[in-house]
Amino acid sequence: MLRRQNRSAPPPSDLKSLSLSVFFRGWRLPNRKFKSWALKMSSLHKPTWIQAGVFEAIMSSTKGISKDTDLLLGIAEKWCSDTNTFFFPWGEATITLEDVMFLLGFSVLGSPVFAALDESGERVKEKLVKDSLRIKKDNNFVFVSQVEWMRRFMNDDDELEHVAFLALWLSYFVFPSAYYHIDEVVFSVAVHVSRGTRIALAPAVLAHLYAELTLLKRHIREFITIEDKIELKRLFKLVQVWTWERFKELQPEKANPLLKGEPRLSIWCDDSTQKRSSNVRKVLEEAKVESFEWRPYTKALENGKFPLFYPEEAMWVLVDNDLDDEFVSFARCVKVSKLVGIDCVEHYFPNRVAAQFGLIQDVTCHVERKSLSKEAAWDEYNKPLDELTLYIPSRCVIPWWKKSSSEWWKKLSPEENQAVESLTPRHIIGDDDDDDTSDSVPSGCKRWKSMKRVYEDDEDDSLTIAQVMRLRKKDT
């Protein structure tokens, strides 16, 4: 049985001190000059950015979102580092690769962030390094600031300006440093992207965020006085917007309309949104499963467009070389794997939150956490999906739980049975004794017995029954 972490929180009198002890250094707001530079570069390089899978991500970076520290601390109290999920009274949920795609615009496909450059790419990188060293020397700086970097490269109209812009974007809005400087560690990625090479930024961003959520949870649990400080540099705006998307009671009073061509993040930017006054801890503690939005991106928005993996009717697709990248992206989102960042590797367990993908939630397996090098972890993440048949649920499907899953959670959380009871029968499909004629199997889904047998026959434990099913030809 999964060990429940100590979720004790500071008493109310200490909450203000706690909030003053946490510094979100990675929370960056775009200034006027950055927006202007992004607009200029977009007009020149949009096709390249689309090819590299960063166009929407860069446009999202031009949107400002004000930090809500109380919300961030409240949701972080629910974090479980054993599973990289949030533990709520009624069950688990987490930030997935799907959320990173929709809210920040990063790609789950492509080469790893540590991908090597060819000879010509290394020459371009070396030019950036030399310019960085020159700026430091001329100004007697230890680091190169955004101001100095933009002064050197902005409006130069040379071939290096594009790469320099991407280096700034990566240093400030993708892999922020604690000291607000241009980080040479991103130069290789900048060169790749400038040439239209797709880099899998989503798993790297999520790996870094998981790692710092664990650090923040530990800080909250061990907090004593305001002298106990912590500095965080990852993209916690994703945590905040994820919470807004999922909990209506915590959303701003008014969201922005989605304008044509704008990224989804723009509905939460600060142009007209007003912070809702809520007791975050109380809302999360008293939340029932019905108050959680399992699939917010399946809701129709004016000027919004559904991806191919949000069909109106459920479907099965064969993964082969001709399959559209959108379906392959969904397969990566629902596959248990390792997430490779620049300086960390984190476990990814989407099987624990299958309902977030419109899939049947079964009892989750024992968590096995094995350490791998970043190369081995990437090979596992990027494992070929050939000859796999992928189930794509309807965007209209409601969340489903196996009866055994709700019973398992009751045993895991006996003190929270009341919240678990809100998993009403309409949400639960039959128990393990259901036969193949059960009418409660979601429309478009093959019979559960067949799905279960396929899973049990599969030796690849990285594919889970509630998500990706490898079907033998005799079953197709």
Model-derived features with residue positions:
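N-terminal leader regions that mediate targeting or early regulatory function
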Residues: 1-186, 195, 199-208, 348, ...
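Hydrophobic, mid-to-C-terminal alpha-helical segments
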Residues: 180-245, 249-263
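Short linear interaction motifs
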Residues: 30, 68-69, 76-84, 147-152, ...
